[in-house]
Amino acid sequence: MYNTSKLFNSTTYLTNDGIQNTDSHMMKNIEWGAVAYLKQSIYGLGITDITINNNSSYYTGGGTGTSYKTNIGQSTSGNITGVYDMSGGAWEYVMGNYNKQAGDSGLTVSGVPAEHIDIYSGTSVAASHLGDATGETAGWYSDSAIFVNSSNPWFPRGGYFFSNDAGVFSFGDYAGEVSDHFWFRSVLSVKE
């Protein structure tokens, strides 16, 4: 998942003019938190809970074609320009990890640059990082709040399409296994 996200920085995906000024990586836990807080702000839905994407085929925006236009409640902003699938659909792994343990991911965690991963030294929300939308928001909107540990060292975010505790502030603990129920989100950013 991490290595796949890094591929977006290759010339296959970007123009020759822009490739030196971009960074692609798998979304970090704190980056998920930033989007979650934006949803909670006046620029997003505010205190209105985001609608769960309950599409069992995991389609972005809750369906095919133009369904994203009618399912704007699934967007962080309440309109089509927001970020979709932050609640429900499939769990989305982020680069949030307990104690540099690989679990079932197959990733050499120690080889991941520090700017691309959030490492947690504890197994409760007391070990959260300020801004990652775990400790400070645990349980908001009745979203899942299960912290990483030695058996399940990876954070997935958002929750399942069929789960009542799915939501933008939902987080869980999993081993890093590949599954059709677990996806990931890539980030492409501009370097200064």
Briefly describe each language-model feature range.
Residues 30-33, 60-64, 68-103, 108-192:
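C-terminal, surface-exposed recognition/capping segments
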Residues 1-86, 190:
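Short aromatic-cysteine micro-motif
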